[in-house]
Structure formats: C-alpha cells, structure tokens
Amino acid sequence: LDTLRIPPRRWLRIVFAPTIVLSIVLSLLGVMYLAYISDPEGNLHDFPIALVNQDVGDTIDVGGRTQQVNFGKQVADALVAGMPADQIDLKVVGISESERLMRSAQIYGAIVIPSDFSKRLGILGVGSVVGGEIERPIITVQTNPGMGPYSAGIVTRIGNRAMTEVNNQVGQQLTAQVRDTLAATPEGAQAPQISGAAQITLAQPIHVVEREWRPLGPGAGLGLTAFFFALLILMAGVVGAMVIHTMVDAQLGFQPTEYGPWYVHYPPTPISRFHTLLIKWGVMVFVAIVISLLYLLVAKILGVAGQQPTQLLLFSVLALIAVGLTCMASLAAFGTAGLLINLAVFVILGLPSSSGTVPVQATPTYIAWLAEFEPMHQVYLGMRSILYFESDYTAGLGRGIWMSLLGLLIALIGGVVITKYYDYKGLHRENLVDKKKTAA
C-alpha cells in the first residue's frame, strides 16, 4: 500500500533512470572487455622483438671453389623482410643491447642467431653426403617471462611462423649448394649420393629452440602476480574510498546508516565540504598503510612477495594513496555520480589497458592509447618492475612512481579547488527539499 503514495512521475525515475545508467555503463564494460581479448594477434601493432645476429660467417667449398658466406646475415635479412612492419617492431641489435632491453622490459622477446651458425650449416651440408650424426644449427627464440604468459605465446608464434619460411629458403639454398658440390666430382669418380634422410634434413636445416630468458622463480604465477597485485591496489583504492566516504558521512550525519533492521541517522555536523574531504583523505592515508602492510603479509605467507619486499610495500602505499585520494576527490566533486566515474576510470577502462594479461600492443589502438594515462597500467608497470625486474627504474618503476605522484597532485589540487569553490558559493551539504519547505 505504501507504494501507492509514490507519484507516477517519480516511478518513471525509479525505473528508467537506473536502467539507462546501467545500460550505458555496462555496455561500455562489454565493449572494453570483449574488444581487448577478442583478437590479440589481429590487433598487433608496434610489438617489440629484438633480432640478434652473432654469426661471424665461414668459408665453404661450393662446386670446387671456396666461398665466404654468412648465412646468419641472410637469415636476419629474410626475417626483417618477412616481418609485417605494421605489427612487429623488429629491433636489429647486438646481444648486449638485447640483454639490456630484456632487463628493462622494453622487448617481449628476441630471435638470436649464434656466432657459429654458418659454420654449423656448412658442416651440415658436408655431412649430408657422409655417414654419421650431425646436429642441425640452432636459432633461439627467447621469451621474456616477466612480461606475462600471453606475450610469451605471441613471441613464440611469431618466431615459429617467421622461421618456417626462412627455414624453407635456407634449405633450398643449402640443397642447391650440396648438389653443385656433388656435380663437380671428377670424371670417372663415383659421385656421392644424398640419402633420403639427408634430403629431409637439408630441406629443414635449422633447429628452432624456444627458451625463457631468465625464468621466473617460484611464486611468480607465470608472470601474473604483478597484474593481480596491481588489481588489488586499485580495488583497495576504489572500494576503500567508497567505504570511507559512506561511513564518514554517516558519522557526520550527512546520510543514514542501516544495520539490518536498525536505521541510524545522526544529526548533521556543521562542517564544511573542504574539512570533510580532509578528514576522509586522512582516513584514506591511514587505511592505505594498513592495507599495504596486510597485502605484504599475505604475499610473504604465500611466497609471492618477490625479492624486494620494502620496495613493494612503499610503492603499494604510494599507489594506494594516489588512487584513494583521487576517488575521494571525485566523490567530493560529483557526489554519488562519482561512484560510477571511479568505476569507469579505474576498473572498466583500467583493466583492459593494464597490459597485465594481454600486452597493450595486442589490443585495439584506442585501448593502447588509454594505457598512456590509465592508473592501473602505471601501477602494473611498477609492480612488474619490482617483482620480476629487480626494481629496475627503467623497467616501469620510474614511470609508475612519477605517474602515481602526478595522480596524487591532481587529486589534491582538484579536491581542494572544488570543495573550496562549493563552500565559497554556499553550496552546503543540506537537504534541498527541507530547505524549500522551510522557506515556504
């Protein structure tokens, strides 16, 4: 019977307002989450991989004459020509530079041609007409496990596809050289024959080996613990801000609190918006320290804290404070709508652009653009550097720190300016309906 007292016009707002808001928010959620996971290889762009050619070349006998060859250079040139430039950022570097790029999380993997590649390929050609077991020359496809398991799979598939074509080209060339050598056998002498097994080996002369560069230790979760740690920090900041905002407002009398069937609504406290925000910020800072310590304790118990627990704790506190204070400033500026804004910025847009599961180079370009400033990506880079790259400043920790400080600065300035402005304009936290009744 109580529902009959609600005016029909208000029923429209009760039913359609949440329907419209949720349709918009959840449609955005569907687009972001399904778009970033639907076709990673089709979305590839600027995916960085190193190509290292250490081959020093060799002198081989071809048709009765010696010839200086460098099969490694031929393979490298074929790989450069065969890689789609719009998808792969192939960096031709030396082994030292490749190691540096791996350490600083600048590349997802590397294709390494060893120094004795030409020599071993020449031995394989000679050995094809004599007895005995001969090993095929090796090219190594290295993956960077700290960049995540999905990126390792992409590197492996790219390397295998490229090397299949190169293997065929080198096999045809090597087979032709062996046949030319056999054709130069002196008249009257019996020319050696290439056995069927040797022909198969010559057709695919390169053995491609997949290998992890510096495998992660136990507790790394195949490179996913950094992502989940970053997710924990973001969720603690967003949920923590929401809980603190609600509970502090309840204690100050700005909104009621329900405990099961009990309903409590304290009288409003005469306090400005600015000072209310300062109280919430202070509580958030204290909570951030406590939660970060609890996270570290849980991580230590589960063995996923890595080798840099102090750095992990300090960065967690910084990131959590930055996220929490930003969410508080949003709630102070937009009120209840700030909850949806925080959800959109930190979760809906943040998780797909984090690169914690699918690399940003394997997502649509608009998601990669979001990663330039989305908070979760910055936190993930810092966590990844601490857990997998020995807190290397250039591996993402530096960016994570500076972007967290920038976010903190924006939150402080924005929160102070907007609450001061509301207070200056006399926009106090009071019930407008009651105010109109009193005025009447």
Regions found by a protein language model. Give the residues of each.
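Extracytoplasmic/periplasmic domains immediately adjacent to an N-terminal transmembrane anchor
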Residues: 1-219, 425-440
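Hydrophobic/aromatic residues in alpha-helical transmembrane segments
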Residues: 28-29, 240, 294, 326
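Hydrophobic, membrane-facing alpha-helical anchors
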Residues: 182-193, 264-268, 289-301
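N-terminal membrane-entry
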Residues: 217-237
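Membrane-spanning alpha-helical segments of multipass transporters and channels
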Residues: 228, 272, 277-440
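Hydrophobic core segments of alpha-helical transmembrane domains
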Residues: 233-241, 411-415
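Juxtamembrane interface at the cytosolic side of transmembrane helices
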Residues: 236-289
